[in-house]
């Protein structure tokens, strides 16, 4: 039985993620490896604001806004951490309010939030300022970089998903899906 425990521990150690792994992945831009449950568990276990922040930034790069909740709660010890937590919670708020407006027709035009360099934030700002053209159930925006974005709801398996389709010229360059 002891051999089984030792073997299980050895195998788990082989696949364990370390803080150094996360830093290396961050430096080389492997955000998909950072925005994973194993890294989330690591920063919770170590109570590391630096790892929590790297995780949150990686999840933003991967457009996994829902993953910002846990690091937002953990970032409170330093001024920089609190500022980052405020930005992450603002993005979560913007996503939720846009979703509410699109799915349930709630007027959010009176809302103003801090300007954040993130596509969902730019769409939120333009939506609340009514800086769009509405075509059927699609909202069309001209982004600050000159690209065009379309915002709409798509239902899959009885789940309404908010979609942002980004176009460079007439060519679809990116699709972001939130719910």
Which residues does each predicted region cover?
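Alpha-helical protein-protein interaction scaffolds
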Residues: 15-97
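Compositionally biased non-globular segments, especially hydrophobic aliphatic-rich helices
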Residues: 11-15, 171-173
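Intrinsically disordered, low-complexity segments enriched in small/polar residues
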Residues: 1-3, 29, 165
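N-terminal accessory interaction module
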Residues: 127-179
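Surface-exposed, polar helix/loop patches in the mature regions of secreted/periplasmic/lumenal proteins
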Residues: 69, 73-136
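Short secondary-structure boundary micro-motifs
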Residues: 8, 41-43, 125, 135-136
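Short linear motifs at secondary-structure transitions and domain/linker junctions
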Residues: 25-32, 114-118, 125-129, 137-142, ...
């Amino acid at each position: 039985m002891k051999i089984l425990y030792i073997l299980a521990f050895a195998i788990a150690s082989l696949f364990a993620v370390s803080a150094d792994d996360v830093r290396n992945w961050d430096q080389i831009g492997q955000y998909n490896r950072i925005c994973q449950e194993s890294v989330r568990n690591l920063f919770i276990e170590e109570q590391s604001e630096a790892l929590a922040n790297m995780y949150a930034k990686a999840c933003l790069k991967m457009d996994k806004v829902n993953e910002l909740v846990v690091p937002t709660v953990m970032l409170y010890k330093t001024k920089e951490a609190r500022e980052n937590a405020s930005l992450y919670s603002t993005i979560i708020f913007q996503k939720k309010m846009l979703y509410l407006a699109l799915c349930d027709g709630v007027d959010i035009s009176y809302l103003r939030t801090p300007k954040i360099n993130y596509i969902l934030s730019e769409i939120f700002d333009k939506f609340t300022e009514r800086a769009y053209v509405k075509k059927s159930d699609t909202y069309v925006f001209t982004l600050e970089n000159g690209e065009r974005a379309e915002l709409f709801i798509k239902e899959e398996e009885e789940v309404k998903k908010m979609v942002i389709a980004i176009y460079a010229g007439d060519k679809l360059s990116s699709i972001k899906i939130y719910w």
